[in-house]
Design a protein with these regions (language model features):
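Noncatalytic, solvent-exposed loop/strand surfaces
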Residues: 1-266
């Protein structure tokens, strides 16, 4: 059993015959690895969980991040963002390969990976950083490529294309950063006719380099994943949207408060 005042929002990650799950946030935060067929626990890693937020407790910390599994050089690494740090585990044994300090207490989105770099970001005006993967032990001094101590509040996860990281912030601003330097290339506000531009959802990147996003005002945006911002379309569904857009078989699925939408060619 797990409880946090803001709820839980992580998803299981399936890789081969294994399932990985960040069971948190909450007092019993644990990263689990299960056998996909039997449900047997193969290994588990415990992380400090903080308070649940009930009864006036204010030690609010936690990670809503999903782990991601990537090939980094000669090995696979299970990459994870936690309060205070980013880290990597051996997906077979659960052994911690490396850790890098720098994140703040609240981690809302999942890490992303490209070109040997893990991009990890805190929420609530916290820090962001890039880490060279493939290390061992505490790599804060050696492998932390860049570090920004305070960035805009973001809840949804970003995407990477051609050496640039794109994310839609809580306030409805599209950010683009160079993944090797952390330099902010652009930040552009996107706003439709909906009553609010606030955003909690993650971006979706298509194979042809287009980003799709939806905000809480029910506005959906399509823009190019290029270092020069180009908004291609804005469409309003007329209802509140909090969840991220899902993609399957060439179709977009959007869950609103009233309807489930499917967008694609007939």
């Amino acid at each position: 059993k797990q409880h946090h005042i803001w709820g839980n929002g992580t998803s299981p990650v399936i890789a081969g015959d294994r399932v990985f799950l960040n069971f948190g946030p909450g007092p019993k935060t644990t990263l689990y690895c299960f056998d996909k067929k039997t449900g047997k626990t193969l290994w588990e890693h415990h992380e400090p969980g903080g308070d649940s937020g009930k009864a006036g407790n204010k030690n609010w910390l936690g990670s809503w991040s999903d782990p991601i599994l990537r090939q980094t050089g000669s090995r696979h690494e299970l990459l994870m963002s936690y309060p205070g740090r980013a880290c990597a585990f051996d997906p077979m044994s659960g052994k911690e390969w490396w850790t890098c300090e720098g994140l703040t207490k609240l981690v809302y989105n999942s890490p992303v990976y490209a070109d040997g770099l893990m991009i990890a970001m805190s929420g609530y005006g916290g820090a962001a950083m890039a880490i060279q993967t493939g290390g061992s032990g505490d790599v804060t001094e050696k492998n932390r490529v860049w570090y920004e101590p305070k960035v805009q509040q973001r809840i949804g996860s970003g995407v990477i294309r051609d050496g640039h990281h794109y994310i839609l912030t809580d306030g409805g601003i599209v950010e683009c950063r160079d993944i090797k330097t952390g330099k902010l290339v652009f930040n552009e506000r996107v706003k439709g006719p909906g009553p609010t531009g606030q955003n909690w959802s993650s971006l979706v990147l298509s194979a042809d380099g287009l980003c799709y996003a939806a905000n809480q005002g029910g506005d959906c945006f399509v823009f190019k994943a290029t270092p020069k911002f180009e908004l291609l379309s804005t469409n309003s569904l007329g209802e509140k949207i909090i969840g991220s857009i899902a993609v399957s078989d060439g179709h977009l699925f959007i869950r609103g408060y009233k309807n489930l939408w499917c967008v694609g060619k007939k």
